[in-house]
A protein has these predicted regions:
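Pre-Walker A (pre-P-loop) alpha-helix and adjacent loop at the N terminus of AAA/AAA+ ATPase modules
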Residues: 202-236
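AAA+ P-loop ATPase mechanoenzymes
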Residues: 1-211
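Conserved catalytic/switch belt of AAA+ P-loop NTPases
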Residues: 280, 284, 299-349, 353
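Walker A/P-loop
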Residues: 235-267, 277-283
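Walker B catalytic acidic pair
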Residues: 294-296
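C-terminal alpha-helical "lid" subdomain
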Residues: 368, 372-432
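Conserved AAA+ ATPase "SRH/arginine-finger" region at the nucleotide-binding site
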Residues: 329, 346-359, 366-380
Length: 432
């Protein structure tokens, strides 16, 4: 068996220690005497595969699942090129074919051969593993299923060419690495340069879940569709009353356009200084990125908005075509102004410049979408719609009466208040 250490493109895996240990055991299979005394290493490998199954939700042939996990996560010159254009031409194909030949040998290896050396059925068990938990601590079910399905295809490949075609198709269709497997990310500024890490537990909110606000949703959809389709689009500011669905709309947009290559990176004010590092990492990838800032506003003493202005406008470098900024805020003017500011501006020789500097951030957002609080009739319509969706059985008159009482005690008229009321009723009914 050719050693994994001879790979050119696919090497230095993040979780490659298990791969090295397993391939060493396989390479030594023709020299049984060498394997004696390595029982601990063998059982440690089985242990790691089972632990990975618990973490990632893998089932079936855990060895194949693990190998597939390595391949779909490895970002190299070949995989990232396939992500953009699909099949590629040139010398790099020869290197990829060589590496896939090695991996095909790993897929084709019969783990039961190891049972001849180590008297146990562990190898057989991990080739038909029944997972007690269908969930995953790292992936959602959709991602886990894609990896397991690809593992089955690769195991059935009759040739290295077919093996390679399956990998190229996966890279083109779903992408490679964390950007290909995940929808949303947060910024980790504890390392230099800052990096993005996946958010694994995403709320499955859809735009249709948001009752009303059809004009606002259409404006958001039109801009986002233009963006994912490669047409000119604008940065978006969603502003208005609290609890009106601004943040839910962003989550809905992500879930609606994820399959078309949309990804979201969540950023907070203290991370604005890291945005240039993040943009540099994603600007050449085959995805559309929305940098999402929730509940954005600035006090008069906060200067982070200047970082944001610089990022939006860009410097000498051309602004990437695959990045937009979407923000939500309860304020139309993001930088707070007070009446006392007028007194201070009397001593400012260029007071109009000072005012314009504070207003200029909003002007960077080409599309502003207003979400206003519903009136009483709209609120009641939201309640009735949500009650029907959640199969709340209650006479309409009683439902609306209780909803009116609820909103008076819990924050007033808003979609959030309506949802909280319905959640209360559902929880109450389940306890009966």
């Amino acid at each position: 068996m050719t050693g994994i250490r001879e790979c050119i493109l696919y090497r230095d895996f993040e979780q490659g220690e298990l791969l090295e240990k397993m391939t060493m055991l396989m390479e030594d299979i023709s020299h049984p005497k060498v394997l004696y005394g390595k029982d601990g290493e063998y059982f440690a490998c089985i242990h790691q595969l089972v632990e990975m199954a618990g973490t990632y939700g893998f089932a079936g042939n855990l060895w194949h699942d693990y190998l597939t996990y390595l391949l779909v996560n490895h970002e190299n010159a070949f995989s990232t090129a396939c992500e953009i254009v699909g099949p590629v031409e040139g010398t790099i194909n020869a290197f990829a074919m060589q590496d896939f030949e090695i991996f095909k040998q790993l897929y084709d290896f019969d783990l039961k051969e190891l049972e001849k050396i180590y008297p146990s059925e562990d190898s057989s068990l991990i080739t038909d593993y029944q997972n007690i938990n269908e969930g995953s601590k790292v992936f959602n079910k959709r991602i886990r299923d894609r990896i397991c399905t690809l593992a089955q295809k690769l195991a059935k490949a009759e040739s290295t060419e077919e093996f390679m075609d399956d990998m190229v198709q996966f890279y083109k269709e779903f992408g490679v690495g964390k950007l290909g497997l995940h929808k949303a990310f947060r910024i980790d500024g504890t390392v230099t340069p800052a990096r993005i890490v996946p958010i694994t537990n995403i709320a499955h909110v859809h735009l249709d879940d948001l009752v009303g606000y059809e004009i606002a949703k259409k404006k958001l959809i039109d801009n986002t569709e233009a963006f994912v389709q490669g047409r000119p689009a604008n940065n978006c500011l969603l502003f208005g009353d609290a609890g009106t669905g601004k943040s839910s709309s962003i989550k809905g947009i992500l879930n609606q356009y994820y399959d078309q290559g949309l990804r979201i990176i969540e950023a907070y004010k203290h991370q604005f200084k890291d945005l240039n590092d993040i943009i540099a990492q994603v600007k050449n990838r085959n995805y559309k990125f929305i940098i999402y800032m929730d509940d954005l506003s600035f006090e008069e003493f906060e200067i982070e908005y200047k970082y944001l202005k610089a990022v939006i406008e860009g410097g000498l470098e051309k602004k990437p075509d695959n990045i937009l900024i979407y923000a939500t805020s309860n304020r139309r003017h993001l930088v707070r102004e007070k009446f006392s500011d007028k007194e201070e501006r009397r001593d400012d020789l260029h007071s109009s410049d000072t005012v314009q500097e504070k207003l200029s951030l909003v002007a960077r957002f080409g599309v502003s979408i207003f979400f206003c609080a519903p009136d009483k009739k709209q609120f009641q319509n939201i309640v009735k719609t949500l009650a029907e969706r959640h199969q709340v059985e209650m006479p309409e008159e009683e439902l609306l009466l209780e909803a009116n009482k609820w909103e008076l005690q819990h924050g007033g008229l808003s979609g959030r208040t309506a949802q909280q009321f319905i959640d209360y009723l559902c929880g109450k009914n389940e306890n009966k």
